[in-house]
Regions:
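Carboxylate/His-rich catalytic cores and anion/metal-binding grooves
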Residues: 100, 303-311, 315
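Glycosyltransferases that elongate glycans
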Residues: 1-287, 297-299, 316-431
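The conserved SAM/SAH-binding core of class I Rossmann-like methyltransferase domains
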Residues: 290
Length: 431
């Protein structure tokens, strides 16, 4: 671990005025920089480092010891910040009216290096600008693994201060039980009472579930303060603090703890992002969709079909892992919005479409081998049903083009690649 930039001072630091060597005037600009720390976590034989999920959990603990900031931004290594106002836009959703139940803010993914025709549907705007935006009207968009701003306490296993995930048309069943659940003695200690109890305040899970670091565990009640920025009390990055931060990133720290199961990013699947967001939603937390221009973050897209299909194979494999695990949305908490549950079911079952697509494209061809037409002669009702289905698909296509703000050609490319992925990556994941 290396501290590249320490905590800034509390007073403003104005830059130098314009000069012959530097024509830019910074005399009215605050040039303080936030703390910058480079962390390389320990990996050793005999301990599963859990890839990205393990790295994010290690960084969560490390940052809690050093800054305990109320918000955490997750960006993949192939993404960069494109708009300096992106964080301000995301934090507005965390600090606005009735925002105390917002767990994370998801930004749409944008990519550079994509060919002009977007042959492999890398932009995927139907999903990022259509589906995610539509989910914002329920409990919010799913977590897609990057470009996401988290509220720190949601990663520690805390429940939301109140639950209101239902709507006038589709009320949540959890609303019937929310009052009884949150009137139990002690549960309201997640806010003011936790701070009043001091450093040994309320924790949603036993202390041992968070590990053996007293400095880290003591930071959790402060992070649950009702005023978010009260949690980020700057500490001096001295030798003792650095040693403690290194200790919480060791390979053995998570042994016999709740990390990866009840705390932090979830282990056991290649799509830890979807499961982590799902765990928050079933507790009653909400998420928000934030799309700004210029684009908040920009990433690098796969440059050939092999890389793109491998990416889709990994996603579809992870979706099936979720479907056949205890995180199956069919059996989720009643605090999950009914339509949000449908969205998660769609996310975990879409690879199965490969079976039906292969069936419908290969079975008719058997007619040429057998000499018999397998499909029965169409009836009048068949044409009626066919007209209804085709009309519905046409309406959905028009709405997707309108809501996602894409052209008909972009919509066609998206459907074209779906056919390609269904006959290859989806099928490989299912088999």
């Amino acid at each position: 671990m290396q501290v590249l930039v320490n905590h800034p001072s509390h007073s403003r630091q104005l830059g130098p005025p314009a000069s012959a060597d530097n024509p830019l005037d910074f005399s009215m600009v605050d040039v303080r920089l936030p703390m910058l720390v480079y962390v390389s976590r320990e990996k050793r034989p005999g301990f599963n480092h859990e890839k990205k999920a393990g790295a994010m959990n290690a960084l969560t603990r490390c940052s809690a010891v050093l800054t305990n900031s109320p918000f955490i931004l997750n960006l993949d290594c192939d993404h960069y910040i494109n708009d300096s106002q992106a964080l301000r836009a995301g934090i507005c959703f965390m600090l606005g009216r009735d925002s105390d139940t917002v767990a994370f803010v998801q930004f749409p993914q944008r990519f550079e290096g994509v060919d002009p025709t977007d042959l492999y549907a890398n932009h995927n705007r139907i999903f990022f600008d259509g589906t995610l935006r539509a989910l914002d009207g329920m409990q919010g968009p799913i977590y897609v693994g990057t470009g996401c701003l988290f509220r720190r306490v949601t990663l520690y296993g805390f429940d939301p201060p109140r639950i209101n995930v239902g709507g006038p048309c589709f009320p949540s069943l959890g609303g019937m039980f929310a009052k009884a659940r949150y009137e139990k003695p002690g549960l309201e200690m997640t806010t003011k009472a936790a701070v009043a109890k001091g450093k040994h305040g309320f924790l949603p899970l036993p202390r041992k579930a968070y590990g053996k670091s007293e400095a880290f565990v003591d930071s959790i009640p402060r992070a649950s303060h009702p005023s978010p920025f009260a949690a980020g009390a700057a500490v001096v990055a001295d030798e003792a603090t650095i040693s403690e931060a290194v200790a919480v990133t060791t390979a053995a720290y998570e042994k016999k703890t709740g990390w990866g199961s009840n705390i932090g990013w979830v282990y056991g699947t290649v799509t830890e992002d979807v499961v982590t967001g799902y765990r928050m939603h079933i507790k009653g937390w909400r998420s928000r969709y934030c799309s700004i221009y210029p684009h908040a973050f920009i990433g690098t897209a796969p440059i050939n079909l092999t890389e793109r299909l491998y990416q889709v194979l990994r996603w579809s494999t992870g979706s099936l892992e979720i479907f056949f695990s205890r995180n199956n949305p069919l059996f989720g908490s009643t605090f999950l919005h009914p339509l949000q549950r449908v969205a998660y079911i769609n996310i975990t079952t879409y690879p199965f479409t490969a079976i039906f697509l292969i069936f419908y494209t290969t079975v008719p061809a058997l007619s040429f081998v057998t000499g018999h037409f397998i499909v029965q002669r169409p009836t009048t009702m068949f044409y009626v049903y066919l007209a209804i289905v085709l009309g519905t698909l046409l309406i959905l296509a028009v709405l997707e083009v309108k809501w996602a703000g894409v052209t008909v050609f972009e919509w066609f490319r998206n459907g074209q690649f779906w056919m390609t992925a269904s006959c290859s990556a989806y099928l490989a994941a299912v088999c």
